[in-house]
Regions:
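Histidine-centered active-site microenvironments of extracellular/periplasmic hydrolases
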Residues: 15-66, 87, 235-241
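C-terminal cap/loop subdomain of S1 sulfatases and analogous C-terminal strand-loop tails that border
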Residues: 27, 78-176
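Long, internal low-complexity/basic segments
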Residues: 159-175, 180-186, 190-266
């Protein structure tokens, strides 16, 4: 909820506050941003204002940080002791060190089952896709919205470029690597080019280490209980009923059609 901060600007409370401004990830009407691991879905603004020795008006910091770091920073500001297992750090702490890499992930969003992982260094974004046979435009909650409807219409009419059609509706590459200094919009996938082999291997190893060290839960399939709960939430909505949704839901659809769904629920 929006709060009129200016109304308390002169108060003692305001003078003691540290204000963090950040946003949700990705624009909802941009198909390649929200819920995906490209820059538009990962990069968010972070502005910090307040009475703290680490904050200087107009100072710009280009370090790689995550919103997890905001959590650690606010806990530290409140006087909490940060446990060692946290995968984040206090941005104002005396032991703060700029991160060499930050990580991002996408799993099931609403009823759309997927798994994507990404690691960002200062210059490169590396993306690992796991469901290679599922196009980026697999059925999802935005399918009844104009951007998705337009994209599907253009594809059916053969009016997309070869690159667009392959990117949105074709098989996904296992790996993607983009030079964020030269290719901000991530159009040219460098993963298969020999000149970038060393960077590909470096980022691949960094991501694999993070997956193992963090015990990334996306390594494990969701249980039937979780999938059934998702099916229950969406099964009566037109956008789900008319879609060729992921095969993981087939058992629930078949049981429902055969009147065995109640028995399956027990």
């Amino acid at each position: 909820r929006s709060t009129p901060l200016y109304s308390s600007a002169a108060s003692d409370v305001y003078k003691r506050q540290v204000i963090f401004f950040f946003s949700d990830h990705g624009h909802n009407t941009s198909l390649r941003h929200k819920q995906f691991c490209y820059e538009g879905g990962m990069l968010v603004p972070l502005i910090i204002k307040g009475n703290h020795s680490a904050i200087s008006p107009g100072r710009v910091v280009n370090d790689l940080v995550t919103l997890l770091d905001v959590g650690a920073t606010t806990l530290a500001l409140a006087g909490a002791e940060l446990p060692n297992y946290l995968e984040c750090q206090n941005l104002f702490g005396s032991e703060y060190k700029a991160a060499e890499y930050v990580f991002g992930a996408r799993d099931r969003c609403d009823y759309t089952i997927d798994r994507i992982r990404t690691v960002r260094s200062d210059r490169y974004r590396y993306i690992r896709n796991y469901y290679l046979d599922r196009p980026l435009m697999q059925p999802g909650y935005r399918d009844d919205r104009p951007p998705s409807m337009d994209m599907r219409r253009l594809f059916k009419a053969g009016e997309l470029t070869e690159y667009q059609a392959e990117h949105w509706f074709g098989l996904r590459p296992r790996e993607e690597l983009y030079d964020m200094h030269a290719d901000l919009h991530q159009i040219n996938n460098l993963a298969s080019l020999s000149d970038f082999r060393a960077e590909l291997l470096r980022h691949r190893e960094v991501l694999e280490n993070w997956i193992n060290d963090s015990d990334d839960q996306g390594q494990h399939s969701e249980s039937d209980v979780q999938l059934r709960a998702t099916y229950e939430l969406w099964k009566d909505r037109d956008i789900f009923k008319s879609a060729d949704v992921n095969p993981e839901y087939s058992k629930f659809r078949e049981a429902s059609a055969n009147k065995n769904y109640k028995n399956m629920m027990n």
